Regions:
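C-terminal motif of bacterial Sec signal peptides marking the signal peptidase cleavage site
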Residues: 13-16
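Proline-rich, low-complexity linker regions of envelope-associated factors in Gram-negative bacteria
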Residues: 18-50
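Active-site acidic/histidine clusters and adjacent loop/turn architecture
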Residues: 41-125
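Active-site-adjacent substructure of cysteine-protease-like catalytic cores
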Residues: 115-151
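Bacterial N-terminal signal peptides that target proteins for export
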Residues: 1-9
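Sequence contexts marking disulfide-bonded cysteines in secreted/extracellular proteins
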Residues: 18, 48-50, 71-73, 94-96, ...
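Catalytic cores and adjacent binding grooves of peptidoglycan-active enzymes
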Residues: 22-25, 110-113, 142-222
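Second-shell loop/turn segments in exported
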Residues: 34-40, 91-100, 143, 169-178
Length: 222
């Protein structure tokens, strides 16, 4: 019953964020509240996603469902352990986000680095996933919960190649080297085909140092 009630509150809060109402919504529990662990089995969709990861040889660990207040929650999430390309700072990710992220790195980023840069990506550096906060940047930012608040987004800062090069979003987004520029534009296009929203330094100054990838509303690719 508690799980059902909290999920209803969460759904209502997220619906309000996407309704076009610019006024801040009053959450049932304030942000920063002590987390509440929700009991009950994962949904069928989440169980199917877990199975997809296992079938794709992705090692992951399911995480307990938790409500953090203020619309922030981690539901149907995993911790990625090993999918072939080490990635830093990954914490809770919704299972669909984890599945999409793995596919992007394996089928978009790694082949692009090999074909365009002549060296394979051996490590991805992220700036994290879950964070209970509002959207950063934009006139209505403070009124909207970020997809990070539901572990449905990941920020990517850099890629390390087998030959030792480190390609960063901050330093290399407008790199005059045509190969580096081609690589970054190629992986952004690849991300835009997979994620709901992709935000780059071309979007605003708040994204100058990373690619924001999420499975929220979209498609939106900048």
């Amino acid at each position: 019953m508690l799980r059902r009630l909290l999920l209803s509150v969460l759904i209502a809060s997220l619906a309000a964020c996407s309704s076009g109402n610019d006024r801040a919504q009053a959450p049932a529990r304030p942000r920063g509240s002590a987390p509440i662990t929700l009991s009950g089995p994962p949904s069928r969709a989440t169980q199917a996603c877990f199975a997809d990861l296992a079938r794709e040889d992705v090692r992951s660990s399911p995480l307990p469902d938790r409500d953090y207040g203020g619309g922030c929650a981690v539901i149907g999430a995993v911790q990625l352990i090993d999918f072939g390309v080490p990635t830093t700072n990954l914490r809770a990710m919704t299972c669909p986000l984890a599945r999409t992220f793995v596919a992007w790195v394996r089928n978009g980023v790694v082949p692009a680095s090999r074909e365009i840069l002549g060296s394979e990506v051996v490590r991805v550096e992220s700036m994290g996933t879950y964070a209970c906060r509002g959207v950063v940047g934009g006139s209505r930012a403070s009124n909207r919960l970020s997809e990070h608040g539901t572990a449905n987004a990941v920020d990517i800062a850099a890629f390390v190649l087998a030959d030792g090069r480190r390609i960063t979003i901050l330093r290399d987004w407008r790199n005059p080297d045509p190969a580096v520029n081609d690589f970054l534009q190629t992986i952004r296009r690849s991300a835009c085909r997979r994620f709901g929203t992709v935000l780059s330094p071309d979007y605003n100054a708040a994204h100058a140092n990373h690619l924001h990838l999420d499975l929220g509303r979209g498609p939106f690719c900048r």
